[in-house]
């Protein structure tokens, strides 16, 4: 399954409810599991971003839909990247002209 990495920032609403952040992630992971999304790692961080989430989704459309739904709740803003494993990158490189 494709892997994604989201860099997460709390909104004003999200930081006001920071004590609930771990429970929100637990609840969210259970909710998106039914869409085939699996959260592999979640880190709370210092600096420009408040969290880093590593997860797998069946496809880009599913990843986008769960991110949009999360952002709509108003607690976070996300910047997301598609990540490639070594074997995926080797396949990509083998297709280069």
Task: Describe the residue ranges of each PLM region.
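An amphipathic, aromatic/His-enriched active-site/gating alpha helix that lines ligand/cofactor pockets
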Residues: 57-84
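A short, amphipathic edge element
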Residues: 36-40, 76-78
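Short, flexible active-site loop motifs that bind/organize anionic cofactors or intermediates
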Residues: 15, 53, 79
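Short, well-ordered beta-strand segments in beta-rich or mixed alpha/beta enzyme
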Residues: 5-9, 43-66
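Short S/T/G/P-rich N-terminal loop/turn motif that feeds into the first structured element of a domain
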Residues: 1-33, 38, 46-49, 84-97
């Amino acid at each position: 399954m494709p892997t994604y990495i989201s860099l997460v920032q709390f909104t004003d609403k999200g930081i006001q409810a920071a004590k609930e952040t771990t429970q929100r992630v637990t609840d969210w992971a259970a909710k998106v599991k039914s869409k085939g999304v699996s959260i592999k790692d979640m880190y709370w961080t210092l600096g420009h971003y408040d969290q880093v989430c590593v997860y797998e989704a069946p496809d880009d459309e599913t990843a986008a839909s769960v991110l949009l739904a999360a952002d709509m709740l108003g607690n976070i803003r996300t910047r997301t990247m598609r990540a490639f494993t070594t074997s995926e990158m080797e396949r990509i490189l083998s297709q280069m002209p």
